[in-house]
Swiss-Prot record:
Alphabetical list of InterPro entries matching this protein: KduI (IPR007045), KduI/IolB_isomerase (IPR021120), KduI_N (IPR027449), RmlC-like_jellyroll (IPR014710), RmlC_Cupin_sf (IPR011051)
One BP annotation, GO: pectin catabolic process
Cofactor comment text: Binds 1 zinc ion per subunit.
Lineage, highest ranks first: Bacteria, Pseudomonadati, Pseudomonadota, Gammaproteobacteria, Enterobacterales
Superkingdom in the source lineage: Bacteria
Alphabetical list of CDD domains matching this protein: cupin_KduI_C, cupin_KduI_N
Gene Ontology molecular-function annotations: 4-deoxy-L-threo-5-hexosulose-uronate ketol-isomerase activity; zinc ion binding
Keywords per UniProt: Isomerase, Metal-binding, Zinc
Required co-factors: Zn(2+)
Gene of this entry: kduI
Catalyzed reaction equations: 5-dehydro-4-deoxy-D-glucuronate = 3-deoxy-D-glycero-2,5-hexodiulosonate
Source organism (scientific name): Escherichia coli (strain 55989 / EAEC)
Quaternary structure and interacting proteins, as annotated: Homohexamer.
The protein's name in its UniProt record: 4-deoxy-L-threo-5-hexosulose-uronate ketol-isomerase
Pfam name, any one: KduI
Residues the record lists as binding Zn(2+): H196, H198, E203, H245
Amino acid sequence: MDVRQSIHSAHAKTLDTQGLRNEFLVEEVFVADEYTMVYSHIDRIIVGGIMPITKTVSVGGEVGKQLGVSYFLERRELGVINIGGAGTITVDGQCYEIGHRDALYVGKGAKEVVFASIDTATPAKFYYNCAPAHTTYPTKKVTPDEVSPVTLGDNLTSNRRTINKYFVPDVLETCQLSMGLTELAPGNLWNTMPCHTHERRMEVYFYFNMDDDACVFHMMGQPQETRHIVMHNEQAVISPSWSIHSGVGTKAYTFIWGMVGENQVFDDMDHVAVKDLR
């Protein structure tokens, strides 16, 4: 488990390129036949990836010991979105088939969660966010047909994109975790511009569906102290509440966003005008 401490905005603005990457970038999300796990002190979110190829991968008691509990989800909820080939997730003996861009919410209290791929030639890639939970909501599969899509932006401003809301109150109940998938239209490069912060929630972006020769310049920092981190395919970045979170790519891309914090009101954000950015 890779533990990342919280960081003050006044400290963050003094960091050089490598310093910013060390604090906020999750460089390797998927490792064959293993799970990766980054634990952030910011709202206690855990992010990572699971890519089973030649064997199943389970997340259970061994992680619980690192969290000071008996098992991983004793006091947590889990959200998973599969960006790879078809797979299965077995939760306490109940098997769910999770296809490409299907998702599974796992409620607090699940003791054993086992991940597998259907075809080793096209393995599943399970990206997950995990957050503290105060009660148990039912484990539920969510398919792309069940999400709440919203299309925003314009080709003229190169920010035409569709936001697919997987884990939001209109789709299913969670304690605090919200997740979704945003896909840019072909030829569009910007996400979340004009940008915003949200004092009451933190967020993690996971960029994927990118060519090897492409990258995204992820914008972060306070609106008057902006910085950037260069992101490549299948990498994640942590965004504290005080930071903007926006990006521009060399080509179109897709990203998964996950939020935890005070509320689940998607539009509860503090907008920043482009003219006010520095």
